[in-house]
Amino acid sequence: KLERTPSEESDESEEAFMFHTKETLGSMHQPLMFTAWVHGVSGMCAMILKLWGFKRYTASNGCSYWINAPMAKEDEWVEARRETGDDARPILSGCAVDDVDAEVAKPIIFVHGLGVGLAPYLPNIAQLLRSKPGRKIALLSLPHISMRATPKVPEIDAMVDTVAELTTKHKLRAPCLYGHSFGTFVIARTCHRYRVSSVVLLDPVAICLCLPKTVSILYHLGNCWSSFKSYVKNNGTKAMFTTTFWRDGGDVLYYLLRDYFLVREIGVMTALRRKFWWATHNLWADQIPDNSLIVLEAHDMLIDCEAVAKHVLRQSNARVIWQDNFSHGMFISPWGFSLRHEVATFLDALPTHS
C-alpha cells in the first residue's frame, strides 16, 4: 500500500490537478457589438487580400484559406510521395520530382495565432509580397480562434489536412510553413505527419509545450483577476492612470484583457480545452527541419524563451533570432518592421527546389 509523505500532502494542497479536456469550459459570452466589430475587421481584411490578388478557397473538410496562386487542374495534382529509408512520412510537396518549372521564391503557407484573424498580419504579408512579388503565399483562415461566431471548431489534424490539400491542389513545391503563436501547433503537427522542407516559427508556444510556464499561462486563468484587484487595492484606482502603472502594472492589465476578452471566448476555449492534446501538439527541437528559423521575443510572457532557445540550439540546426525588448506578438507592430524584414530575408534565401 502506497502512503503519501507529509511533503507530498502539502504539495497537493498547493497545486490543483488540471484536466483541461474534462473541466468546465469556462467561456464568457461576448457582447454582440464586439462580435460584429470582429466580423467587420475580417470583412475589411478580405477586401484588402482580394486587392492584393488573393482568392478564398474552402478545403474538402470545411477549413478555408486564401492564396494568390490558381488551383491546378485535377489531372495535374501530385499526391505526396514517400522516399525509401527509415522515415516513412510523406513529403509535403505539390510538385513531382522531375517538374522543372522555376519558382520565383519559396512558397509559404502561413498560419496565424489567437486574435482577430489575419488582419494584424497584413503588414507582414505586404513585406513578403514586396520582397518577392511573384511569391506564392497561402494563408490559413481560422475563425474559431479569431473571436468570430462560428458553428464548428476543427481539430488541429483537420487544419493539417488543409495544409496538405492546398499544397497539392495549388502545386506548391516544398513550401515553407510559417506560423505565429497558436499557428505553431498546426505546424508542429504537420512536421509530425509530413517531411517538411523548412519552417519559420514566431513566438513558438509549440516547442517544449511541457514547460511549466507555458502550462500555467495557458490554463491558470483565474489568477489574473485576483492580481488585478490586489494591484488596485495596494496602489489605489488613481494608480491605473499613471505612467508607473503602464510600465510596471501593464502585464497585469494585459493578462486581464487577454483572459477575459480573448482566451475566454467560446471558440478559443473549445480549441484550447476540448480540441487540444499536449503530447500530440508538442514539438521537440530534433523534429524541426534543418532550413528553419525560430524567432523568440525576449519578454514573451507565454513561453520560457531561454529554455526554448537552449533546447533548439542544442538539438537542431535551426537558426534562432533573439529579439530583445519585445513581448509576445510585437513583431506585427510598426516597430517590428526590422524583425519582419529579417524574416523575409531568411525566406528569400531558401532554395526553391528542396
Task: Locate each region found by the language model.
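Catalytic active-site module of serine/aspartate enzymes centered on a nucleophile-bearing elbow/loop
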Residues: 75, 318-354
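Conserved acidic catalytic loop of the alpha/beta-hydrolase fold
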Residues: 95, 157-175
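Conserved HGGG/HGGXW glycine-rich cap/lid loop of the alpha/beta-hydrolase fold
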Residues: 101-147
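Conserved alpha/beta-hydrolase "acid-adjacent" motif
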Residues: 120, 294, 301-307
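Short alpha-helix in the alpha/beta-hydrolase fold that links the catalytic acid
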Residues: 124, 290, 304-314
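Active-site nucleophile loop of the alpha/beta-hydrolase fold
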Residues: 142, 200-212
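Gly/Ala-rich beta-loop-alpha elbow adjacent to hydrolase catalytic centers
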Residues: 178-188
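Short beta-strand/loop motif that positions the catalytic acidic residue
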Residues: 288, 294-297
